[in-house]
């Protein structure tokens, strides 16, 4: 079920530009101008050379570095992120831990989804 939720969640950012803008703003605040890094550098291996993410304290907050992934050459020019997808996966898998370990991300996720038009 995680994969289905993850892939369906990508459509939220794609179909609602305001959600993508909110994701970019959250990432900007969370990473504080840090550089894009290869996902292979962040997690070891297994990703294509062009897959990049912003380092943050994802792991220390119970999450995964993949949450910082963006699609594009920069955050400003990103056409998608992984925030909604990985956030929804985590919310469904471990809601109590998500709240306890990264309330900031959970609050971003809930408020962003709540603000979407019906």
Residue ranges and their predicted role:
Residues 1-118:
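Active-site-flanking segments in enzyme catalytic domains
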């Amino acid at each position: 079920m995680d994969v289905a939720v993850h892939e369906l969640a990508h459509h939220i950012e794609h179909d609602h530009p305001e959600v993508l803008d909110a994701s970019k703003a959250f990432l900007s605040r969370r990473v504080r101008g840090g550089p894009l890094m290869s996902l292979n550098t962040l997690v070891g291996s297994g990703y294509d050379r062009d897959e990049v993410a912003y380092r943050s304290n994802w792991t220390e907050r119970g999450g995964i570095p993949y949450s910082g992934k963006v699609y594009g050459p920069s955050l400003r020019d990103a056409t998608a992120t992984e925030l909604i997808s990985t956030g929804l996966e985590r919310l469904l898998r471990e809601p109590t831990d998500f709240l306890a370990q990264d309330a900031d991300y959970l609050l971003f996720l809930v408020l962003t989804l709540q603000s979407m038009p019906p």
